[in-house]
Amino acid sequence: MELKKQILRDSYAVKITATEGDKVLGWGFLYVIYNDRHPEPYGLIENVYVEQEYRSQGLGTKILKDALQEAKDRGCYKVLMQSRHGKTEVHNFYQKIGFKDHGVNFRLDLIDSKPKQRD
C-alpha cells in the first residue's frame, strides 16, 4: 500500500475582522474546505472572538453572519463550528444564530500552544 499527499489549492481561509479606526474589535475565521465526499465545499468557522468591552452589542452576530454569507457565496453545503465544553453562553449564542448541537469533536494536541487572546 502507498499513501499519496495532494495539496488542495481550492481550499482556503477567510479572516473577517471588525475594526473601528485602527482598533481591532473582533474577528472570526471561515475555512472553505473541499473533499471527495461532496461536489460542494463545506465551511468551518473558528475562533470567533470579540473584545470584552464590545460584547453584547451585536458585533459577534455581524461577524458570524458575514462568515455565513461568505460560505453561501462560496457554495458551501454546510457550515461547522466548534466550541469547548462548558461554554453555555457561547453555545446559546450559536444556537440563536441557527446552529444545532450535532455530534462530538475529538482533538489531539500536537504541540503546547496557547491562544493569543483571552476568552
Model-inferred region functions:
Residues 109-119:
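Generic C-terminal helix-cap and adjacent flexible tail
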Residues 35-45, 101-102:
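A conserved beta-turn-beta hairpin within the catalytic core of GNAT-like acetyltransferases
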Residues 61, 85-103, 108:
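Conserved active-site alpha-helix within GNAT-family acetyltransferase domains
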Residues 50, 56-69, 96:
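Conserved acetyl-CoA-binding loop-helix of GNAT-fold acetyltransferases
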Residues 51, 84:
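Residue-level recognition of the GNAT/N-acetyltransferase active site
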Residues 71-83:
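Conserved GNAT acetyl-CoA-binding A-motif
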Residues 1-40, 65, 109:
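Acetyl-CoA-dependent GNAT
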